[in-house]
A protein has these predicted regions:
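Juxtamembrane extracytoplasmic/periplasmic/luminal helical "stalk" adjacent to the first N-terminal
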Residues: 20-69, 82-86, 125-126, 139-142, ...
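Short N-terminal helix-loop-first-beta-strand/juxtamembrane motif that initiates sensory/input modules
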Residues: 47, 51-54, 80-99, 125, ...
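Solvent-exposed, extracytoplasmic
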Residues: 69-84, 156, 160-202, 209
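Structured interaction and signal-relay segments at domain junctions
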Residues: 81, 92-109, 196-201
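Extracytoplasmic/periplasmic ligand-binding sensor regions of membrane-associated signaling proteins
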Residues: 99-173, 221-235
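Short, surface-exposed beta-strand-loop junctions and turns on beta-sheet-rich folds
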Residues: 106-108, 134, 198-201, 244, ...
Length: 257
């Protein structure tokens, strides 16, 4: 039963039912169990990403990071890399957008054209933008913080978290049943995470089913709820819940016919 797998992700979680409650349909059972489950899966992702962000903040406060000297910064980031198993790249960027990665050193590309970069220069943390990494080509989730010295932004530290590795981590840690489909949509409806790697970073319109487009619109418009739609000739029911950390909508679905 789905609830058994949920307990692997969230210790101590229980769902109480009154002894006199009327019998529920299989669809009702799925909706109740899935609502607990999707919030558990969301918690795994939020905990991981917030942990990466916290670690970056700690690194950004060090004298080595604030020095702006790559060799000094690299030592700090190398230690960070050892504790993150979902990263595609760990990097230090300068205000002009030039950057170095722990894996490759100086990069030929520049980050100044990234939509999130002005926020870093303004002294703001960044969590959740979806990009195809310039240095690795992997579909990645940006987690980054500014580095300041004497009140001035002198650079930024970032981790490009691989979407596929993060999705796999959730599935493995929670022992997710094979008949369930988990995905997370960003504010535009793009799939930040997906159990099926081929659908990561794609929009519902890319799949071409109008009922999925309508269901996605409903998901994006609400904090929590249930939808149904057709995909590849099958009817699918899904429950969803919003992450306060990223703003993503986490969706757990199952085919019913």
């Amino acid at each position: 039963m789905l609830r058994r797998h949920v307990l692997a992700a969230v210790a101590g979680g229980t769902v109480a039912m009154a002894s006199g409650a009327p019998a529920r349909s299989a669809e009702d059972d799925f909706q109740l169990d899935a609502l607990v489950a999707v919030q558990a899966y969301r918690a795994v992702v939020d905990t991981h990403l917030s942990g990466v962000l916290t670690a970056l903040k700690v690194c950004a406060r060090t004298a080595d990071a604030r020095s702006g000297n790559w060799e000094a910064v690299k030592g700090v980031l190398t230690g960070l890399a050892e504790g993150i198993d979902t990263e595609a790249a760990i990097w230090f960027a300068r205000p002009d957008g030039s950057y170095n990665t722990v894996e490759e050193g100086p990069a030929k590309q520049n980050l100044s054209d990234r939509a999130y970069f002005p926020n870093l220069l303004a002294g703001k943390d960044v969590l959740g933008p979806l990009v195809v990494s310039k240095s690795t080509g992997h579909r990645s989730i940006i987690t980054a913080v500014p580095v300041t010295e004497a009140g001035k932004v002198v650079g930024a530290l970032g981790v490009s978290v691989r979407s596929r590795l993060l999705s796999d981590m959730v599935i493995e840690r929670s022992s997710m049943p094979a008949d369930l489909v988990l995905y997370a949509l960003d504010g535009t409806g793009k799939a930040a995470l997906h159990r099926d790697p081929k659908r990561m970073f794609r929009y519902p319109s890319d799949i071409g089913d109008t009922s999925l487009d309508k269901a996605t619109a409903g998901i994006l418009a609400q904090e929590i709820g249930r939808v149904s739609y057709s995909i590849e000739g099958k009817t699918r029911i899904a429950v969803f819940a919003r992450s306060k950390l990223t703003g993503w909508k986490f969706v757990l679905a199952r085919d019913v016919g």
